[in-house]
């Protein structure tokens, strides 16, 4: 087990959950806070339940609320996103999930800083320890390749409190 990269650190969290015999691992990043007193109750809501299509919910994601109170990404004005705005695509996904009739819906997106994994999933599918960024999307792809899905809970979130950006434009572009 390594401590280099988000995937490797999350695998350490999964290993600790296994050592202590926990059946659910909940992840948050260090620049987030849980403002809801029922955060952990909402984290496990629906886990191991079956959908009407007889699909078992083993991994789910909540979402981020930015410092202004919005779950949507601000459109980037950087030249690096001139031709393809990740924010625009992300906001389409979020709007569809936020306005869904059901609280928990199937998702192609996972917020790595607000996710819950049941042992039935994380004992079969670890995070890729060699991925330094984007481990959440990679995990969704790995789930799919093993016949599982990620689910989105539109009533479970964390408040994002990012530190002041100190990286150079070149460094941000490389990420």
What spans do the regions from the language model cover?
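Acidic donor-binding loop at a coil-to-helix junction in glycosyltransferase catalytic cores
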Residues: 132-139
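C-terminal, non-catalytic tails of nucleotide-sugar-dependent glycosyltransferases
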Residues: 92, 173-175
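Short beta-strand-to-loop element that shapes/binds the nucleotide-sugar donor at the catalytic cleft/hinge
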Residues: 54-78
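A recurrent flexible, glycine/aromatic-enriched loop bordering the glycosyltransferase active site
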Residues: 96-116
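Active-site donor/metal-binding and catalytic loop motifs
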Residues: 146-149, 153-171
């Amino acid at each position: 087990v390594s401590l280099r990269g988000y995937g490797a650190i999350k695998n350490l969290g999964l290993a600790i959950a296994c050592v202590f015999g926990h059946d659910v691992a909940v992840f948050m990043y260090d620049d987030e806070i849980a403002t809801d007193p029922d955060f952990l109750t909402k984290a496990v809501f629906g886990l191991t339940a079956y959908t009407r299509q007889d699909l078992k919910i083993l991994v789910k994601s909540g979402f981020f609320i930015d410092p202004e109170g919005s779950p949507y990404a601000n459109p980037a004005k950087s030249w690096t996103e001139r031709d393809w705005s990740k924010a625009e695509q992300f906001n389409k996904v979020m709007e569809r999930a936020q306005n869904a009739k059901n609280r928990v819906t199937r998702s192609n997106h996972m917020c790595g800083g607000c996710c819950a994994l049941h042992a039935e999933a994380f004992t079969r599918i670890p995070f890729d320890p060699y991925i330094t960024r984007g481990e959440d999307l990679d995990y969704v792809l790995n789930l799919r390749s093993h016949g599982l899905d990620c689910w989105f809970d539109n009533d479970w979130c964390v408040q994002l409190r990012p530190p002041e950006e100190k990286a150079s434009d070149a460094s941000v572009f490389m990420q």
